[in-house]
């Protein structure tokens, strides 16, 4: 029998969300909308990434009251974010009973050198990555699910596309290498050799990799599935749109039926305005959340 909190169990829990949509919510009402639309999980926050970006300052773990309200409102899994390197925030979230913890670059990092040792927790962790080096380091630390970093709160899919393509291209390269070449590749990527060896033997990443950071429309979600995403996170794209209920349902349907272009065309009709987007080139270096983490 598998033991609660083992790597196998935690990875299996994340695998159960495959093919689905995970939505950011800030209260019980939004959580109910997400669940009714078919979300496989919700991410409980005080503010969606677009509002965190607009407010500036230091972004921290959400008030536990908000998280508990969301947990009571829905029957689907509830995730919550901890700051990069903030071990105590993660322990608090675990004590609250959340189903997953996202060690997230959307929040202001608490440690500029170390990420959380996720192997010490029974709850599974989600982490962002831009390339295979970051992905492998997070897996070695105990991450059970990955997601592209994209550029959160922008409604601009370009960075999520870049990150998904890069990770997948690097995975293909590793799979094609002989085992004696992997040590040099591990050095080049700053990645643990054992993780690359596992990727080579499996022919893929050992954990699921979702798309996140800039998904704003049904077509965006379908695009990321075409590029090899195992599922989709939608942060600001739902509740910053003109019609959250319609957008939520449409994005869930487009994620499931991402190869049915007639359906996606139908889903895209009459939705109202998508969230206002931001051109990535207009962001200052310190405004680029994807740069957080190492």
From Swiss-Prot:
InterPro entries cross-referenced by the UniProt entry: Aldolase_TIM, PdxS/SNZ, PdxS/SNZ_N, RibuloseP-bd_barrel
GO molecular function, one term: pyridoxal 5'-phosphate synthase (glutamine hydrolysing) activity
This protein's UniProt keywords: Lyase, Pyridoxal phosphate, Schiff base
Catalytic residues of the enzyme: 81 (schiff-base intermediate with d-ribose 5-phosphate)
Reactions that this protein is recorded to catalyse: aldehydo-D-ribose 5-phosphate + D-glyceraldehyde 3-phosphate + L-glutamine = pyridoxal 5'-phosphate + L-glutamate + phosphate + 3 H2O + H(+)
Transmembrane segments: none
CDD domains: pdxS
Entry's EC annotation: 4.3.3.6
GO BP field: amino acid metabolic process; pyridoxal phosphate biosynthetic process; pyridoxine biosynthetic process
Residues at which D-glyceraldehyde 3-phosphate binds: 165
Binding site for D-ribose 5-phosphate: 24, 153, 214, 235-236
PROSITE patterns, sorted: PDXS_SNZ_1, PDXS_SNZ_2
Role summary: Catalyzes the formation of pyridoxal 5'-phosphate from ribose 5-phosphate (RBP), glyceraldehyde 3-phosphate (G3P) and ammonia. The ammonia is provided by the PdxT subunit. Can also use ribulose 5-phosphate and dihydroxyacetone phosphate as substrates, resulting from enzyme-catalyzed isomerization of RBP and G3P, respectively.
Oligomeric form and interacting partners: In the presence of PdxT, forms a dodecamer of heterodimers.
Classification via NCBIfam families: PRK04180.1, pyridoxal 5'-phosphate synthase lyase subunit PdxS
Protein name: Pyridoxal 5'-phosphate synthase subunit PdxS
Organism, as annotated: Anoxybacillus flavithermus (strain DSM 21510 / WK1)
Organism ancestry: Bacteria, Bacillati, Bacillota, Bacilli, Bacillales
Gene name linked to the record: pdxS
């Amino acid at each position: 029998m598998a033991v609660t909190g083992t790597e196998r169990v935690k990875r299996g829990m994340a695998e159960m969300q495959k093919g689905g949509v995970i939505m950011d919510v800030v209260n019980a009402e939004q959580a109910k909308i997400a669940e009714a639309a078919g979300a496989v999980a919700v991410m409980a926050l005080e503010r969606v990434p677009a509002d965190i970006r607009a407010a500036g300052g230091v972004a921290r773990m959400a008030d536990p009251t908000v998280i508990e309200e969301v947990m009571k409102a829905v029957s689907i899994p509830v995730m919550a974010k901890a700051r990069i390197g903030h071990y105590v925030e993660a322990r608090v979230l675990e004590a609250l009973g959340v189903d997953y913890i996202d060690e997230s670059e959307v929040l202001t990092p608490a440690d500029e050198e170390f990420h959380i040792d996720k192997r010490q927790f029974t709850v599974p962790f989600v982490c962002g990555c831009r390339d295979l080096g970051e992905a492998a380091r997070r897996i070695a630390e105990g991450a059970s699910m990955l997601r592209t970093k994209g550029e959160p709160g922008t409604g601009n899919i370009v960075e999520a596309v870049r990150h998904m393509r890069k990770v997948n291209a690097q995975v293909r390269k590793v799979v094609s290498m002989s085992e004696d070449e992997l040590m040099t590749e591990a050095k080049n990527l700053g990645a643990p050799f054992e993780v690359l060896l596992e990727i080579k033997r499996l022919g893929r990443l050992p954990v699921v990799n979702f798309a996140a950071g800039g998904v704003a429309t049904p077509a965006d979600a379908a695009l990321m599935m075409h590029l090899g995403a195992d599922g989709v996170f939608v942060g600001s794209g739902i509740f910053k749109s003109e019609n959250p209920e319609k957008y939520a349902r449409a994005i869930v349907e487009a994620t499931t039926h991402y190869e049915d272009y007639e359906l996606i065309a139908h889903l895209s009709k009459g939705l109202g305005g998508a969230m206002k987007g931001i051109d990535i080139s207009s962001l200052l270096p310190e405004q680029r959340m994807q740069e957080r983490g190492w």
